[in-house]
Amino acid sequence: MDLFSSLPNELLYHILSFLSTKEAALTSVLSKRWRNLFAFVPYLEFDDSVFLHPEERKREKEGILQSFMDFVDRVLDLHGDSLIKTFSLKCKTGVDSDHVDRWICNVLARGVSDLDLFIDFRDLYSLPHEVGVSRTLVVLRVGSESDLYWWQKFLCLPMLKTLVLDSCWLCIGQFQILLLACPALEELDMTNTRWKDSNVTVSSSILKELTIDLHGCCSVVNLKSLSFDAPSLVYFYYCDSLAEDYPQVNLKNLVEAQINLLLTQAQIEQVRALNNEMLVADDVFPGLGNAWKLITGLRNVQQLYLSPDTLEVSFLSLVYFWLVGRI
């Protein structure tokens, strides 16, 4: 008898959890005992790029996408009604959206707590309603290389602590709805998120980590105002176009902040044009002088990183920077 065969099932489940679902499924050929053992692992990971071997142009072969969908269906069927803790799905155009919806609803019905979705379809894809009303989700990651839409009028995610959004639409009024719908949210990461609101407020008494990274993203609108009322925040990464105003910046417990205010070349030239004594900031670029409101709102931070553009727009006449103080 080999060493692995003598181990209890619970330990084998744990070992298999370190493999991708495809790799775990390959163990079923080892023996009768292993045949369906992988089906009881509560951690499922499906990545069509791994399954389809894009380097071999396998995706273009007839029937290969169907075989991927059949594989996911078969694994979920083998799991029956058993608990699924983590479900990761990464798929691109060609995989049927009805299948994707069915898979997501399947794992939500079985109490999944960690849901990681990267869905890259050519057409705008909307996640099923069940994602926004899950009472078991603790971690939710939603991403795409294009644009993804999953918002709805009613959201309720009472257990959610970590939310990561990549290339998602935030329609008018939905950001505030989102924060209210996630009363336990401690970490929010927004990358390439498109604002539709012109006035946004990040308000949360328990949020601890906030990342706003819109580098390379063309928002639908330029923000007229962006406020932060997050007294429990300890980490803040902000990379976005300069808002016209920062009326409130309440981040009194901040430990680390990284600020990169993005300016177009035209805006940079306009900033430099302010050396003309006949001009003031708002004559050139509305709200340019309000960047200082954001910087002064970070006065309690322990570690502060400012990009060159941020320094330039915050200190309009700065030609020399010398820091004196006790570190």
Curated annotation (Swiss-Prot):
Cited SMART domains: FBOX (SM00256)
Keyword annotations: Leucine-rich repeat, Repeat
Domain of life: Eukaryota
Domain F-box span(s) in chain numbering: 1-47
SUPFAM superfamilies per the UniProt record, alphabetical: F-box domain, RNI-like
Membrane recorded as keyword: no
LRR repeat coordinates: 116-144, 161-192, 199-230, 235-261, 277-308
Protein name, UniProt field: F-box/LRR-repeat protein At3g58900
Source organism per UniProt: Arabidopsis thaliana
